[in-house]
Amino acid sequence: DCSSYRHNCVCLKIGEYYKLHCNDAIFTILGPDKDFYNTCIANSEKTKEKSSNVKCIETIKVNSLDKEEQYVPGEIKWPEIDSTSAINESSIVFLFEYEGLKILFTGDSGRNGLANAINFADSNSIDLSDTQIIKMPHHGSRHNIDIAFLDRFTHQNRTCYISCTKGDEGHHPSKRLINLLNEKGFKVLSTSGSTLHRSKNAPDRGWQVAKRIECYPTMEKLNL
């Protein structure tokens, strides 16, 4: 429905995608498209006949993160093929724009879902290269990200936000991913069980500046 919303918000359908204009802010839905979403739902662990296969895959992933290796700068190995659950792949990916700031929200999307969103942006002339902030999918899991996705972003002050619990609960975020993000020139910030705020021209409220996460000396091993 592209009717007008309250608070000066208007939804516009542009070709095959939607943009929500709310005052000076713009929200653009990049994915998933209908075909990709339907495929994800059909293959979801929440679809009864698929559940046993997906649970087996997820168990293997968790067990593969038990050991660590030393981090050697410039020599991070990264799997060419990796996957997450179908329900994660169905997450909405959208771009938020406000006064020159671009933030990409990725939900729990995996490699395929992100590629679907990137391809959609390219085909509709939506430039993502100058996005300043990227919310890393699925609490900073390495299974959801490939190097080609990270190489799309070239803004000088590019920053990654990771929403996760405090400490190393559940193996999130991935130390290997954090080290790779640093090598790719991203400033890495993590909630670690707290809340992060970003403000502009706001009065001092006594907040502390979020500390950048630097490279870890060790990281989880890969079973390549």
Feature map (PLM): residue ranges:
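Short amphipathic alpha-helical segments and helix-helix/interface helices
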Residues: 1, 147-151, 175-179
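Hydrophobic beta-strand segments of well-ordered beta-sheets in folded domains
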Residues: 9, 25-27, 131-134, 156-164, ...
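Flexible, glycine-rich phosphate/dinucleotide-binding loops
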Residues: 36, 112, 169, 197
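A generic structural motif
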Residues: 129-138, 164-167, 188-199
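Extended C-terminal subregions enriched in glycine
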Residues: 136-142, 159-182
